Amino acid sequence: MLTAIVGTNWGDEGKGRMVDLLSEKYDIVVRYQGGNNAGHTVVNDKGKFILNLLPSGILRDDTVNVLGAGIVIDLEHLFNETARLREGGIAISPANLKISDRATICMPYHKLLDGLEEDRLGDKKFGSTRRGISPVYADKFMKKTLRMGDLKNIDHLRERVAGIVEWKNLTVAGGYGHEPVDVDEIMAWLEKFGKPFADYVCDTTVYLTEAVKDGKSVMFEAQLGALRDIDFGIYPYTSASTTLAAYAPIGSGVPQLKLDESIGIMKAYSSCVGEGPFTCEMFGDEAHALREAGGEYGAATGRPRRVGGFDAVASRYGAQMQGCTAIALTKLDVMSYMDKIPVCVAYELDGKRIENFPGNIEELERAKPVYEYLEGFKCDISACRKPEDLPKAALDYVKYIEKAVGCPIKYISVSAEREGCIEMF
């Protein structure tokens, strides 16, 4: 079985929680795109963990985890993240973590450039996490990056690094007027944070190809959501990578494989980190109440998330882009404080009702939500474990979303713990 776990919205839908829950059915979990610019929060019997780079399967003792070729890796962050998990009792070794030799290294100057550009943009900034993601992907396509396979021979990299640094300083010093990047500092950084992972690096294409031939099941874990995809998201307020399920085999290094299923993760309401149009956004006390009820603060940045009612227009589009065969609806329990639950069923654009998600940023900025309101269920549902345990109003809300999105809802999350998930069929 080859399954992708993907976000249908702006990210932060609860993918890590669902990967942790479902990964017991899989032998291997693969991260295939992005970097440490988003976080997956997992609560299990070992504690609460926030994962930025590592696949969520790392929390299961018998699961092999892979960082695929499409990933960009900040070595310092990976060093600290693995150390933090080990302190929490999680075992990490080359036996359960394999890193593609083709994965790109996110260097310190990528983070520097990310911050310098956000500062230059001022009020026009994109809301970057300043983790260097866009600069490193840009350099990847300029063919001026290092890859994880290069860590096998750090001592022979100096000449190559010097050439890249000379080129980067044309921008860092020449363009932004910042102090130039120092080659010695970069080499020391690679030595300190890169060498510890040299034994983890391998040809993951060979590993995954052989594993699938041997009948192993693989889960592909995405980062962010469909609306952050570089091509089909809310451009330019997107990530720099392809966040779609269709990219999972490619970013994992096994483009010859075909997915069996794509499980789309969406919240029972909307949330968003960063800038850009967010049609269903709530403000003031209304937003504060939902943000506090849902604990809506970024796992990677700690930034308060923008929140709003469920957006059926955006979610339907996201599910289509992800080719979803089923939906996991998360944080249904958060809605229990509402008397009436708002659902955006369409947009009003220049006086006309539309039900398709606009691809043009200017149109999306002008769009206004058209709401319908459903009865709230006004009770604690966190102890529910079967569909029949849910109050009728909660089930009605789930069925309404299922019809609006056009995809069956297979899982419903009603609490943060592993057992707090209801399987609908």
Task: List each language-model region with its residue ranges.
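Non-transmembrane, aqueous-exposed alpha-helical and coiled segments at domain scale
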Residues: 1-425
